[in-house]
Structures are given as structure tokens and as C-alpha cells.
Design a protein with these regions (language model features):
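Long, intrinsically disordered, low-complexity segments
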Residues: 2-5, 118-131, 160, 164, ...
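Flexible, polar/acidic helix-loop-strand segments at domain edges
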Residues: 6-130
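Structural register within alpha-helical repeat arrays
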Residues: 131, 138-145
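Alpha-helical solenoid repeat scaffolds, predominantly canonical TPR units
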Residues: 135, 152, 159-162
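Structural helix-adjacent loops and short alpha-helical linkers that scaffold large soluble proteins
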Residues: 146-155, 171
């Protein structure tokens, strides 16, 4: 237990206890296609991701330690969102298969298929090269080439925006190096492309030198009735 003033001294946005995923509403559609948010369902299973619990009297909080507190509604709440370790998916340091980022991987998974805790059960071949990458490769080649013609630049911009419009974007963006690199980062996430992109751009050392990766931890704040969620970068 620590004092809540140490971590929750900032005024945080709050989100409903039954819908913490509302924190990510209005984001790029590809985000929800790639990751599971706290409180979402995967098939018929609710995904519980929680790393902290603020005491109802505001005297302190629990973070990444199994504990329980009574809320102002008289119900018992737990640090990780549930009493049993098989019921939650985040931040428990005692086992190695809980998320520490606040999110779970979703891309490429088939929601309707039953989950099996075993190796080599998949039947889908690995997609090494897909059409979206072809479009992004072309856009990058044109923007990096100093002698690109106006027609090539227009075709490359069309290719770049075709990737975005498939993901429900309505607006067009300009063909710039920054935009091409950002779209590769978003569109090709979790496809084993990022390391090679950074190496090719000679920016790998800048991205990872003295870089501390942080997670977004959902805390259930019991100081209100009903209780609500806040997200803390830790």
C-alpha cells in the first residue's frame, strides 16, 4: 500500500467501472483491431486488466500487490479486478503471462475459434508480405527518391491514403516522410517490420537509447460511488 497522493496527485479523467475501454474511444480504427482494451470482451469472455486500487477513504492505494478493499457501495474490490488469478489478465508480478502494458494482443487472432493452451495448433500461414505493405513500400520509395516526378508523387500519395481509407479514415494526408513512417508504424504493427524500418532509416539508436517503456495502468478509484477507473502511466 502506498499513499494515493504520490501517484494520483494529478487530476485524471475518469471512466465508468463497467466500460473502462471508453478511454480509447475515437481513436484510429486500427488500434481496436490490433489490441484488446481493459473491460472489452474477447468472444464471450470479459478481459479484466487492472493494476491498482485506490482506497475509498483516499488514504492510500494498492499497486501490483494482491489486496482487497470495500467500496463506498459496500462491495469488495480487488487490486487486479478479480479475486482469482485465472480471472484477470494484467500486472500480477508473480507470474509471467500477465500484461505489463495495459493491453493484450489481438491482431491475427480468430475470436470465434476456441482457445487451446498448446503449441502448433494454428493453421493460418504466416503473412510475410501483404498488399498494404506494397502500397507503403511504394510511398516510401517515392518520397525518399530525390528525382521523383509529380506523377509518381501523386500515385504514392494515393497509395498512402488507400491504406488509411481501408481503415475508415475519410481525410487525405500529404505525402511526407513523417506521414509515410507513421503509417508504417501503425499499419504494420506486430508484423515484424518495425525493427527493420528503424534500421533502414538509421533511427534505431535514437528510438531505443535510454528509452524507458511505460504501461498504462487502470486504477479502480473507490473514492466515489459508483467507483470509476483512471489510467496512470507507470
Amino acid at each position: 500500500t502506498r499513499r494515493s497522493s504520490d501517484l494520483l496527485s494529478t487530476r485524471y479523467l475518469s471512466f465508468p467501472i463497467d466500460k473502462p475501454y471508453q478511454a480509447f474511444a475515437g481513436r484510429d480504427a486500427r488500434l481496436s483491431a490490433m489490441v484488446l482494451f481493459p473491460g472489452q470482451n474477447f468472444g464471450s469472455t470479459k478481459i479484466i486488466i487492472q493494476g491498482g486500487l485506490v482506497k475509498a477513504d483516499g488514504s492510500g492505494y494498492h499497486y501490483r500487490t494482491q489486496a482487497s478493499e470495500k467500496g463506498q457501495d459496500g462491495l469488495i474490490y480487488y487490486t487486479y479486478g478479480a479475486e482469482k488469478s485465472t480471472e484477470y489478465s494484467g500486472f500480477d508480478p508473480t507470474l509471467g503471462h500477465y500484461t505489463r502494458s495495459g493491453f493484450l494482443f489481438k491482431k491475427f487472432l480468430q475470436i470465434e475459434s476456441p482457445v487451446e493452451q498448446a503449441w502448433s495448433k494454428g493453421t493460418q500461414p504466416w503473412i510475410d508480405f501483404r498488399y498494404g505493405e506494397i502500397l507503403l513500400n511504394y510511398a516510401e520509395a517515392v518520397i525518399e527518391k530525390t528525382t521523383s516526378t509529380s506523377a509518381e508523387k501523386q500515385a504514392a500519395q494515393d497509395a498512402l491514403n488507400a491504406v488509411r481509407k481501408r481503415a475508415a479514415h475519410k481525410d487525405d494526408i500529404a505525402l511526407t516522410q513523417a506521414n509515410v513512417r507513421k503509417e508504417r508504424f501503425v499499419e504494420l504493427a506486430f508484423e515484424n517490420k518495425r525493427r527493420w524500418d528503424l534500421s533502414r532509416w538509421r533511427t534505431f539508436h535514437k528510438e531505443f537509447e535510454n528509452r524507458v517503456r511505460k504501461g498504462l495502468v487502470p486504477f479502480l478509484d473507490l473514492r466515489t460511488n459508483p467507483a470509476h477507473y483512471v489510467f496512470v502511466r507507470v
